[in-house]
Structure formats: C-alpha cells, structure tokens
Amino acid sequence: MSITTTRRRNQDSVCCKATRASIKVEAVSGQTVFEKQKLLHNFDELPEWQKDNDKILTGYVRETLSWKKCLYSLFYWNNETVNIYTHLVPAIVYFVFAITLTNYFLIPVFPSTSWSDYTVINIFLMGAFSCLMCSSCFHCMKQHSEKQSNFWSKLDYLGIISLISCSMIPIIYFGYFDHISYFSLFTIVTLVLATFCTVCVLHDKFNTSTFRPFRAMFFILFGFSGLLPLTTGFFKFGIQGVLNRIKVSFVFWEALFYISGAVIYGFRIPETLAPGKFDFFGSSHQIFHIMVVLGSVCHLKAIIDSYKLMHSHIHP
C-alpha cells in the first residue's frame, strides 16, 4: 500500500470523525435550543416538591432556580398567569388608593370627619394590598425552588391574616364609635387571634398538601371570629341599632364570597370533576382569587357606607 493511499485514508477517517462530532454538537445544540424554548411542562415532568394539584395537568413553569426566569414567566401564558394578575392588578389599585388618600374623593366629608376615619379606612386598604400583593408574588416566585416556594407560601398566608385583621378593625371602629372600650377590647382580641394564626402558618407542616382542607377551614374560622363583635352589637344595640351603624348587607355578601371561595379552593372544584380541562382557565385557585377580590370590594363598600352611617348618626 502506498504512502499516499494511507494518508488519504487517514484524512478520510479524520473527516468522518469530525463530521460525526459536528452532527453530535448540532444535535446537542438543537436539544439545548429546544429546552430553552420549552417554557411549559406537564405535571409528571415536575420535581416532587412542585406536585401539588394532580388535577391540573399542563401549563406548569418547572423549577427555575432563577429569579430572572420567575419574573420572565409574567410575560408568557402559563397556568399561574390568571392567579398572578387577578391579585396583582387589584393590589396596585388598593395601594394607589391608600398612598394618594383617594378616599378623600370617594367619601363625603362631614363636620365630624376626622383623621381617625381616614386612618381606619387606609388600614383596610393596606391590608388588602398586602394580601393581594403577597399572593401575586407567591404565584410568580414559587417555581424558583422548594425553599423559596415555602418562604413565599408563608408570606401568602400572612397576607391573608393581614386582610382578615385589617378588615375587622374598621368595622369595629365604626360599629362602636361611641364605645371606645368595646372597640379596644375587640381590636385586642383580633390582634391576639392574628398572632396565634401567624404562629400556626409559620409552621412547615401547615404548608403541606394534606393540610389543604384544614387551611381553608382555618381561615374561615378566623373570619368567623368577626361574629363576636357583631353578636355583641345585636345584644347591646338591637338589630335595628346594628343596622344603623354597620352596612351589614355588604358584610353578608363579603362573607358569602370568602366562604364560597374557600370551599371551592379546599375541595378543588371544578378540576377534580374534569382533570386537565381547567389548567389555564377556571381552576379552583383562580376562582378563589376572584372571590377574594370581590369580597374585598364588598368590604370596602361596607366600610365606606358604615362611615356614612356613623356621621349621619352624629349629624342627622
């Protein structure tokens, strides 16, 4: 065999190896591009810690380990998009209302109107803001990692406690405007219960999937603690007396929205009835979010109308 022929075969062999290597690199590169383009994943592709609702089958943002990627999920459609924006937009609205004292323009001014009135209204606005913003941040950031998911989940629960507490205080204030000792007593009771609830939600076991029905019942019971000042008012002022102080009708609608939302959330209706059909629209968590917003709007209306009732009573 000649030297020239041997060299030619060696060159051909090298070329073949280079070609195979090139094809391999292109395949790997193509796979990398594909992986970058694959933003959404199915339930069975998730790590175990992300598997919460097995009735939602598609549209997941898989563990990112990146704050940038979490924020980027705000700009493409996934099964958390509705959850994020149904609370982000109202949170911003409530915050603007609070910091600009928009309630100056929302409510009439009476001769007896004081800064205390605006303060308690803004307590509710900031409580609603903190609840909705914590919720929105949780749904955006929870896919970062298991550790961050647990952290933001606890903030989400603290936001709910904040909303419940900050909802009760203004109603108690307007209901007992001429009985400061009652207002102080029920405010202290509310804050003590809020502290107890805070200790509970900070416990890691509270955040597990098995505690889902318990979590729903937990927050319902905390909300029902508001019946204590209401019942006391019925005994002290009579039914008509309470109706002259508090806009009870909107409080009723608020409770209906909150309880209905919590029950739907706790039992995962409707996705339990039709898995995979409500991955992007109409899932229990999305319905719960909308119910919370509607309930908060009803409560704001109840507070403003109670303010009007109080000052109409002082200056008929």
From Swiss-Prot:
Origin: domain of life: Eukaryota
Membrane topology: Multi-pass membrane protein
One GO CC term, this protein: endoplasmic reticulum
Segments on the Cytoplasmic side according to the record's topology features: 111-117, 178-181, 240-245, 301-316
Transmembrane segment boundaries: 90-110, 118-138, 157-177, 182-202, 219-239, 246-266, 280-300
Glycosylated position list: 79, 207
GO biological-process terms attached to the record: intracellular zinc ion homeostasis
One annotated GO molecular function: signaling receptor activity
Subcellular location: Endoplasmic reticulum membrane
Family to which this protein belongs: Belongs to the ADIPOR family.
Designated name of the protein: ADIPOR-like receptor IZH1
